[in-house]
Amino acid sequence: LRLDDSLEGLDELNDTLELSGAKLKSGHAELPLYRAPSLDWALSGQNGLRFNRDDAFRRISRSFHAVKDSEYTPPESLHNVLRKYQRDGYRWLRTLDGYGMGGILADDMGLGKTVQVLSYLLAMKESGQRLPSLIVCPASLVLNWQEECQKFTPQLSCVAVDGDATHRAELAKQWAEADLVVTSYDLMR
């Protein structure tokens, strides 16, 4: 191992994790939980550097690597509706939630992110967690969310916020009791 390689690896790690020079000099750095996947990815490529990973970090790392094998199963009413990759997306959301984190589902349009999120929200409701949840999307998709909610998760009450100010004021009276409130980016401004 060449020292230059180790220093380069340390520099890359520092850039990835945005560590201060003082933290590096101290030999100890604490990072927020949401940085664990980034840290794990960065450490996997550092063959010349030694790192101590505690049990909690190893457990978190394993759970993110094994999302597909997690114990989270979609709500019974959606289990046979979701495709395999959608069940994986559901498990990803549940894994993140299990650590108090949020995340983003991103793929090509039309692959079912809406139903993945709805399955997650239904599971939260079934487990007794208090809703409502707010969905902010393009105006062209507000009614789509409401239709998908009625189709796949009729157990969730959904309020689609649209229309003029008077209509929206009437809808606002329903928000507290709704499981899901859907609105557009424009109306959120």
Predicted regions and their residues:
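Glycine-rich nucleotide phosphate-binding loop and flanking beta-alpha elements
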Residues: 143, 188-189
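Charged, low-complexity
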Residues: 1-103, 156, 175-181, 185-187
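Conserved SF1/SF2 helicase motif Ia
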Residues: 100-104, 108-147, 157
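Generic structural signal for beta-strand residues in well-ordered domains
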Residues: 75, 82, 98, 110, ...
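Short, conserved clusters of charged catalytic residues that mark active-site
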Residues: 77, 88, 116-119, 144, ...
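Conserved nucleic-acid-binding Ia/Ib motif block in the N-terminal RecA-like helicase ATPase lobe
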Residues: 132, 136-182
